[in-house]
C-alpha cells in the first residue's frame, strides 16, 4: 500500500496510506477546476483537515503546505488559501480507482486552479 509522507506535523516521522485514508470518513464531491484542463469530476477521498485533526492540527495552523508528486511536481499552498479552501486527498475519480498516472492520491481543491490538483502524491510538507 502506497505511503504518503507527512513532514512537519509531528516530531516523529508521520505518514498515511491509501488503506488508512479509505478507513476514515470518506466523501464524494462533484466539482471542477477553474481552468479548462480537467473539467467536472466526481472525486472520492478524505479532507486533509480530517487527517490533520488526528494530530490535533488544522490547515490554518500552517503558513505553507507543499504537496509533492512522484514526478517531482510540487504545489505550494499558502496560509490565506489554506484558510479559504478545502483540500481533498482523493483516491477515486468518477467511481473508479485512480489510474497509474494519478495514483496513489490526487489532490482535489473544489473550484480552484487545476495547477493545485497535484497527482501521484507521495509527500506533503507542512510549515508553521
What is the predicted role of each segment?
Residues 1-128:
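N-terminal intrinsically disordered, low-complexity segments enriched in P/E/S/T
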